[in-house]
A protein has these predicted regions:
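Short, structured segments at the rim of ligand-binding sites
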Residues: 1-275
Length: 275
């Protein structure tokens, strides 16, 4: 929200976001980016309020400390109306960022390097409206794949934008879930059971999250629940957030066999639908 406000009105005020309970979600990437573009940032710790103002935004080279999806998006939406050229290094390049850049270009922005981690933005004075079809939600698609497997159901997920799913189909396949691409749809047949693969050397499969094109962290919770009903074992390694796996105690109370190794890792021993 703040990025577009800053670009259009020269100021943006927002209360401190509440966020969720998956771990620390620092906002430094956003505000450091705004400051480099010429904005002044003030945080009122008493009121827990963020204020960002700028008389004039100027293009600059920005090296992001982390490939933050929302941080990159906020900086892009600010830089498109800054004077001069902005280069964003270590930019997030998820499909959602790619479609944001494509939509902004349709509105009159000048962004090149789309789909890479180095974006070049030539500032423009104004943007126009456009028609844009948003991507399907890859988290919902992964959730439906898991839902089909865990309930032994047959489903077809329509219009998934398959080329933008990255590793999602292959990771679910490693859990033993059968699926078939049919054009831009995914067909999942009913399965009585599914068996987790191991690595080539026979060691336990590890599934971990990573920035795009790695496996999205938002689906690790789904993978963990699906694995609890499989045959075999898997190590889930949540690298990005330190509190995301703390829900496993609820699954253990329900009968799941899960060992929480540390805040970032859990070993799931599948019980083949026996709980």
């Amino acid at each position: 929200i703040v990025g577009p406000l800053l670009a259009r009105y020269g100021k943006g005020y927002i209360p401190k976001p509440g966020g969720d309970k998956i771990g620390r979600r620092r906002l430094d990437t956003h505000f450091i980016g705004f400051e480099k573009l010429g904005a002044k940032f003030v945080y009122d710790s008493k009121e827990e309020f963020y204020r960002v103002t700028a008389k004039q935004l100027k293009g600059v080279d920005i090296h992001l400390e982390e490939a933050s999806v929302t941080g990159t998006a906020n900086i892009i939406m600010t830089a498109v109306m800054a004077k001069g050229k902005t280069n964003i290094y270590n930019a997030a390049c998820e499909p959602y960022l790619q479609q944001l850049c494509k939509m902004l270009n349709s509105m009159g922005a000048k962004i090149t390097g789309v789909s890479s981690n180095l974006l070049h933005i030539e500032g423009v004075e104004s943007l126009n409206g456009c028609n844009h079809r948003i991507l399907p939600d890859m988290i919902e698609i992964g959730s439906f794949i898991g839902l089909a497997a865990i309930t032994k159901s047959e489903i077809t997920i329509k219009n998934v934008s398959y080329e933008n799913l990255g590793l999602i189909p292959s990771v679910f396949s490693k859990l033993g879930i059968k699926m078939e691409r049919q054009g831009d749809d995914i067909y999942i047949p009913a399965q009585e059971s599914y068996e987790i693969q191991s690595f080539i050397d026979g060691s336990i499969l590890t599934i971990s999250d990573a920035p795009w094109p790695g496996f999205t962290p938002d689906l690790l919770s789904i993978i963990l629940v699906v694995a609890s009903q499989a045959k075999g074992s898997v190590l889930i390694h949540q690298k990005m957030f330190e509190s995301r796996l703390f829900f496993v105690d609820k699954l253990i109370d329900m009968g799941a066999q899960i060992i929480l190794c540390d805040p970032h890792r859990a070993t799931v021993i599948g019980l083949n639908h026996h709980f």
